[in-house]
């Protein structure tokens, strides 16, 4: 079971809690243990501030991933971590990239959840493994390959607080 804490700190429209839960549970289904995570939806100001604090980048990014650093034995339910999603950036990217907004949301949530599970895209081999899993999961939802039309970028700009 997934315990999802959805925090909405923006007035911008966003997917429903049920949609976020569906995308997270799909990405996390390989994990058999109960899990807890937070998704915080933010505006560009908060997104920029967090990106600056954790990555020293002075702009809002689409998703920041913060894997939990608390050993599971200290918790009732294992804490996976937090995703912080900047709604305006997600909307802008979907428009600029000609992608269906729901498909882009699903992709970024799945991508962020995979980061919480330890997946990364620092080198080509890791990126290929992560992207293949993203494609597979998105196809199950009926969404197209998010990388099909993008030969130059191998991964969304989802970042973890540890990656620089």
From Swiss-Prot:
Highest rank taxon of the organism: Bacteria
Entry note: cofactor: Binds 1 zinc ion.
Keyword Nuclease attached: yes
EC number: 3.1.-.-
Keyword set, alphabetical order: Cytoplasm, Endonuclease, Hydrolase, Metal-binding, Nuclease, Ribosome biogenesis, rRNA processing, Zinc
Principal place of residence: cytoplasm
Function comment: Single strand-specific metallo-endoribonuclease involved in late-stage 70S ribosome quality control and in maturation of the 3' terminus of the 16S rRNA.
HAMAP family in alphabetical order: Endoribonucl_YbeY
InterPro entries for the chain: MetalPrtase_cat_dom_sf_prd, YbeY, YbeY_CS
Species this protein is from: Pseudomonas fluorescens (strain Pf0-1)
Family of the protein in this entry: Belongs to the endoribonuclease YbeY family.
Biased composition, class Polar residues, residue ranges: 154-164
Cofactor(s), names only, from the UniProt record: Zn(2+)
Biological processes annotated in GO: rRNA processing
A GO CC term attached to the entry: cytoplasm
Name of the protein: Endoribonuclease YbeY
Presence of keyword Metal-binding: yes
Compartment annotation: Cytoplasm
Region spans: Disordered: 142-164
């Amino acid at each position: 079971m997934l315990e999802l804490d959805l925090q909405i700190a923006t007035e911008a429209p966003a997917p429903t809690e049920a949609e976020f839960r569906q995308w997270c549970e799909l990405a996390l289904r390989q994990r058999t243990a109960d899990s807890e995570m937070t998704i915080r939806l933010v505006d560009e100001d908060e997104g920029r501030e967090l990106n600056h604090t954790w990555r020293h980048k002075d702009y809002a990014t689409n998703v920041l991933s913060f894997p939990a650093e608390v050993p599971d034995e200290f918790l009732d339910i294992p804490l996976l971590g937090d995703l912080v999603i900047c709604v305006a950036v997600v909307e802008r990217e979907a428009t600029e990239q000609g992608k269906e907004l729901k498909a882009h949301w699903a992709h970024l949530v799945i991508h962020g959840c995979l980061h919480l599970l330890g997946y990364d895209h620092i080198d080509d081999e890791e990126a290929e493994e992560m992207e293949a899993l993203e494609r597979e999961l998105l196809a199950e939802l009926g969404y197209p390959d998010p990388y099909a039309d993008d030969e130059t970028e191998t991964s969304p700009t989802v970042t973890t607080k540890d990656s620089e």
